[in-house]
A protein has these predicted regions:
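General beta-strand structural signal in soluble alpha/beta enzymes
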Residues: 23-27, 45-46, 66-70, 87-89, ...
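Generic non-transmembrane alpha-helical segments
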Residues: 9-20, 54-62, 119, 242-250, ...
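Activity-critical C-terminal alpha-helical subdomain
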Residues: 448-488
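FAD-binding subdomain of flavoenzyme oxidoreductases
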Residues: 96, 109, 114-248
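Glycine-rich N-terminal segment of FAD-binding domains in flavoprotein oxidoreductases
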Residues: 27, 32-92
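Glycine-/small-residue-rich beta-strand-loop submotif within the FAD-binding core of flavoenzymes
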Residues: 50, 79-114, 150-152, 216
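C-terminal substrate-recognition/cap domain of FAD-linked oxidoreductases
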Residues: 228-232, 237-433, 451-456
Length: 488
């Protein structure tokens, strides 16, 4: 339980130090960060590192607790704790450098993918920005949360290079080659000298990111995007059995998305109320919903890149491989697919940063909680995860609305649980389903790759063996001994 008097004192101290413009307590603003179960005490909006250091010092002196976010807050569990002070870094939004020749950028935490893409286009740089589907997400947040996109640069943790964070005591730390004053390789060589610590500042409450470097993809000479649909629910296994070797051997190098029919229908603005019946839809109804939109039960999106002749050779291989899947249809021209979906999906794989046609959450609500398990890119495992997740969702009255993104040897799954955000009973039902999913998936050997603030304690319990939680606790005590930054 957070001490409200201390939070009020912390906000007053920050306001006194930085001025009224740096703190917002208005109900309209708090509502953007609130959930039915948690309302922040206020929002602090530093404009630069100097103001951030002052805010941390003032909050620490008053015994306040802060929850840092890079640019707004997203998802149903946007605030993990009731009466926490949100430290929103959206005003720290400078694009510090974009280097076309070496294909990297250095940005502050408030910079979004849309803003970075617009800057690159304004300079006519031949560089692509990989984004995880939401163009208004912060580039830094995507690294911190270990998000994934859809180009060959889909693994945002892997493509991050160079980091600056501010510790709870106001000290700035540059990682990797950034620790060397005259380094020429801060955004070029990830590891620097000595222990590599960048990962400590992802999915943690140890510090606040102030600068993040990331690699950008040079525009390739040629590419070929494609889609593969499979009609039946059980077609997921053979589809991924073909995809696995193609990913492992880097034939299909991008972050390959595989969305079920309901996920793709939701992207097109369809709602549960558009279909007959009540409660979770049966497999036959999901299949019919996909077919009506020119989609399969499963819909895979991939792309090939390189020299024109090489792309042509690889296309013959890939087309034949996916064509061997029972009930599969390989589409390379978008024929029969809604042009809005085709354009957006193909764009995500070719550096076109844009909003999707519609928001997934509106399938049956206005917000969504996500559960994010990881599986091997293997048909049997992926099907096992899907079936147990589908059944758990059905037990709680939810449809299975899901997408997986295959990156290297694993697939990151995003399972959406839409909810009416202003309704406490709806939010509680959604959270109960999410907790049940996390537990069932852990029992089956599938761990989470990301979770929203309000579910961290639930996920932490599934990673309790092997001494990892003890190590995290020791690091937290060393870097933030007064727990200035919130642990949900």
């Amino acid at each position: 339980m957070i001490d409200q008097a201390r939070q009020a004192a912390a906000l007053t101290a920050i306001e006194a130090a930085l001025g009224a413009g740096a703190v917002d307590r208005s109900p309209a603003v708090l509502a953007r960060y609130a959930t039915p179960l948690a309302i922040p005490a206020g929002v602090v909006l530093p404009a630069n590192e100097a103001q951030l250091a002052v805010a941390l010092s003032a909050a620490k002196g008053a015994g306040g607790i802060l929850q840092p976010v890079c640019n707004g807050a997203h998802g149903l569990e946007k605030t993990g704790l009731d009466k926490v002070i949100v430290l929103d870094l959206q005003r720290m939004n400078r694009i510090l450098e974009v280097n076309e020749d070496l294909a990297y950028c250095l940005v502050e935490p408030g910079v979004t993918f849309r803003e970075l893409d617009a800057y690159i286009k304004s300079k006519n740089f031949k560089l692509w920005v990989d984004f995880p589907g939401n163009p208004d997400e912060s580039v830094a947040a995507s690294f911190v949360e270990r998000s994934a996109g859809y180009t060959p640069y889909s693994d945002h943790s892997l493509m991050q290079c160079g980091l600056e964070v501010m510790l709870a005591d106001g000290r700035l730390v540059r990682t990797g080659m950034g620790a060397m004053p005259k380094s020429t390789c801060w955004q070029l060589f990830k590891f620097g000298y000595g222990p590599w610590v960048d990962g400590l500042f992802t999915q943690s409450d140890f510090a606040v990111p102030t600068k993040v470097g990331t690699w950008l993809m040079p525009e390739p000479p040629a590419f070929k995007t494609f889609m593969v649909t499979v009609e039946s629910e059980d077609g997921l296994a053979p589809l991924l059995d073909v995809l696995g070797p193609l990913k492992l051997n880097m034939v299909v190098a991008n972050g390959v998305a595989v969305g079920n029919a309901l996920h793709e229908a939701a992207l097109l603005g369809k709602k549960r109320s558009d279909y007959a019946g009540q409660g979770p839809m049966a497999a036959s109804a999901v299949e019919a919903a996909g077919k009506a939109l020119g989609l399969g039960y499963w819909n895979l999106y991939g792309s090939l890149y390189g020299l024109p002749d090489n792309v042509s050779i690889l296309w013959d291989l890939v087309n034949g491989a996916f064509g061997s899947v029972p009930g599969a249809k390989v589409i390379a021209d978008g024929r029969g697919v809604d042009p809005r979906l085709w354009s957006w999906r193909m764009g995500t794989m070719t550096g076109a940063v844009a909003s999707p046609p519609a928001a997934i959450a509106q399938w049956s609500g206005n917000q969504a909680l996500t559960v994010n398990p990881v599986s091997p890119v293997d048909g049997e495992d992926a099907m096992r995860l899907y079936e147990l997740s589908r059944d758990t969702c059905a037990e709680h009255g939810f449809d299975m609305v899901s997408e997986a993104v295959a990156i290297w040897r694993s697939a990151n799954h995003r399972q959406f649980l839409p909810s009416t955000g202003s309704d406490k009973s709806s939010a509680a039902r959604t959270r109960a389903c999410a907790e049940a999913l996390i537990g069932a998936q852990a029992e089956a050997g599938f761990g989470q790759v990301f979770t929203e603030p309000g579910l961290r304690a639930t996920v932490d319990k599934t990673f309790a063996s092997g001494g990892l939680s003890t190590l995290h606790t020791r690091v937290k005590k060393a870097l933030d001994p007064t727990a200035l930054f919130a642990s949900a």
